[in-house]
Amino acid sequence: MHTVVVGTSGVTASDVLAVARGGARVELSGEAVAALAAARGIVDALAAKPDPVYGVSTGFGALATRHISQELRAQLQRNIVRSHAAGMGPRVEREVVRALMFLRLKTVCSGHTGVRPEVAQTMADILNAGITPVVHEYGSLGCSGDLAPLSHCALTLMGEGEAEGPDGTVRPAGDLLAEAGIDPVELREKEGLALLNGTDGMLGMLIMALADLDRLYKSADITAALSLEALLGTDKVLAPELHAIRPHPGQGDSAANMLAVLTGSELTGHHQDDAPRVQDAYSVRCAPQVAGAGRDTMAHARLVAERELASAVDNPVVLPDGRVESNGNFHGAPVAYVLDFLAIAVADLASIAERRTDRLLDKNRSHGLPPFLADDAGVDSGLMIAQYTQAALVAELKRLAVPASADSIPSSAMQEDHVSMGWSAARKLRTAVDNLTRVIAVELYAATRGIELREGLTPAPATRAVLDAVRKAGVEGPGPDRFLAPDLAAADAFVREGRLLAAAETVTGPLR
């Protein structure tokens, strides 16, 4: 099994994916253990002094003015975890919780939180045992970190609350720890607070969304190319010299991908209908510009994610010179903004794909294809309602594109009077990515059927590879009306599992 070693300098997106989705083991480096011990020494020294230190000898949030005596400090740390584990709603996905826990461990190991080495080791042990705390959908405002979600994780460290075992059964966390031979943690000064105060949930979901969107944007280039073929469009608009004079990197990559898929096609380069078009419709001609803008948005989001992965997000933080200082680094605005940017890009990519699908189904705009790609139009409805489903998905995506980060609701008696709503932005982006997959699947279904109805014209070799693979996957070709939902589900799985991309790349080589 793959092992990820956590040091003091952060982790990579690949590390997060390996742990969250691949179940990789986690180990602490010697450097991290030393940094943990050094920072803990600073916290212990400050805890022994009479001066108030936030999170060590004071209350939290609006209660920070309350001095906490020595004998109550362990209870203070337990209490913050218990009281902040106030999430509601359905459980979030296992991969999200594993990313959340791993990224909190990453920050703990930075040496800036004051958490003891044994607490960090217990976090790693829980991940390695396949124990997943029950975390709920609602409870984070994306400022002071993802407080409620991280509190549910910290509760498991204490042997309290509920968690899912490696067999998928939800049980008391204490029982699962005992079976795994893991001792619950007895929290000390600052540790409860340090386990809760980070942007780890929204960051983990951003990293996973970027991984999914990398595949989906390439898949969307493929389906756009297939639609262009089915509509007898021209590939001249994809010429590299046209995109070089507007040098947005994503646009050039998207155009290159489409051109690679279309190489060798007999359906492109000229118009086959009786009334030749001077230009194709925007949804066909401008596909690289729209997809490319989304790719460039992803590039910015990756940069934000990389910076956040290299960050130590906590409040207060332990500095090498011995100070423990309050700060505002827990504010999720940088992550929240790019999550919202991506939701807008996803909605627009889906919108242009739906417009191409609708064009394929309209006999007045499809340049010779039958109405709704039906076998016997009138008796058969063809893909009419598949486009309705696609339109419903796009409408939902437009609602999901409304920024969460533009909103803020004050909390904690107005002490925390501006928040990022980054967790909400991340949750809606996950739904958006899921729906984009379905939208691309419907375009794939329509475009492949349209190409097969162009008898006597040979599609591109890459298109042929996709056609062969999608038919083997159980997506039926042209013919009389039938129960469509199974075909659409098969197309969805074909896109979601990366088989569309893999089929095209058997001919094109790796797409950009």
Q: At which residue positions do the language-model features occur?
A:
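Well-ordered mid-protein domain cores that form the structural environment of catalytic cofactors
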Residues: 110-128, 132, 143-147, 167-188
